[in-house]
């Protein structure tokens, strides 16, 4: 693939597409094609690139009272797509800890947990991905699902998207046994500068000009709260300090209808894992 990364600690940024379903009966996947992993020795952060740029510009565009203080930065916010995943996952490998920040609406829901090492069973199967990465297959039961990964031994970085890690190389493709989720590596590059870890961490801790409702729990509790919010919009509104409200949508023919306050959602860590 024309990229050589040494094991002595260069920073890298890997771009992934994330495919997921909200209902197991669905045939088509929803896609987030701009997920990023920034890795450096001791830590990593997994985030969405569009959300990162919108957050960075928001910090410039607004003052501490939420008023627009930089019109140029404010206009640039709209150059990046809305609807991108706002969730962020931080891993501290040296402390064996992780933190996920879920950010629906004006809510910052932080879940903290102990990082488990997946017991990867390495196989003899190898292949070359469509992007030209030579990879080897491994499997493990991890966080309530059976995961299959293909990792790249030529990139000696024991990391991957989300909370997937611990293989003897960067994870290039990962999916669960039900194929509800897929992560696919698009490209990887060495960084001449530091990762975005500190910048994203600072924003999550003190966003400029944004009034947020912050909740911090152990991961099991945070997942329960998050999953309920994703399935019940009335509950999400209440967590954001708002009264439940009806949302009206208009179709292409001009017909309006009230959007359901409930929706399907499948979490990466299944509900039953925490029971």
Region roles according to the model:
Residues 1-4:
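Bacterial N-terminal signal peptides
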Residues 8-120, 125-127, 134, 148, ...:
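Extracellular or lumenal secretory-pathway regions
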Residues 122-185:
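Glycine- and acidic-residue-rich phosphate-binding/metal-coordinating active-site segment common to enzymes
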């Amino acid at each position: 693939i024309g990229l050589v990364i040494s094991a002595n600690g260069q920073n890298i940024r890997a771009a992934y597409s994330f495919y997921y379903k909200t209902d197991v009966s669905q045939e088509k996947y929803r896609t987030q094609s701009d997920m990023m992993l920034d890795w450096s020795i001791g830590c990593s952060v997994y985030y969405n690139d569009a959300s990162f740029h919108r957050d960075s510009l928001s910090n410039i565009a607004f003052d501490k009272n939420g008023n627009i203080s930089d019109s140029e930065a404010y206009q640039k916010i709209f150059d990046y797509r809305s609807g991108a995943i706002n969730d962020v996952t931080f891993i501290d490998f040296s402390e064996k800890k992780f933190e996920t920040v879920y950010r629906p609406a004006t809510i910052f829901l932080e879940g903290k947990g102990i990082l488990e090492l997946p017991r990867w069973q390495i196989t003899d199967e190898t292949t070359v991905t469509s992007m030209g990465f030579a990879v080897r297959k491994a499997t493990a039961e991890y966080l309530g699902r059976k995961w299959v990964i293909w990792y790249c031994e030529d990139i000696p970085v024991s990391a991957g998207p989300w909370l997937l890690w611990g293989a003897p190389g960067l994870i290039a493709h990962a999916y669960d046994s039900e194929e509800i989720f897929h992560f696919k590596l698009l490209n990887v590059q060495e960084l001449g500068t530091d990762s975005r870890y500190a910048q994203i961490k600072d924003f999550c801790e003190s966003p400029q000009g944004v009034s947020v409702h912050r909740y911090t729990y152990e991961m099991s509790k945070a997942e329960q709260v998050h999953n309920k919010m994703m399935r019940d919009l009335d509950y999400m509104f209440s967590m954001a300090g708002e009264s439940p409200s009806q949302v009206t949508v208009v179709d292409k023919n001009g017909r309006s209808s009230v959007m359901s306050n409930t929706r399907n959602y499948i979490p990466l860590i299944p509900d039953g894992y925490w029971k």
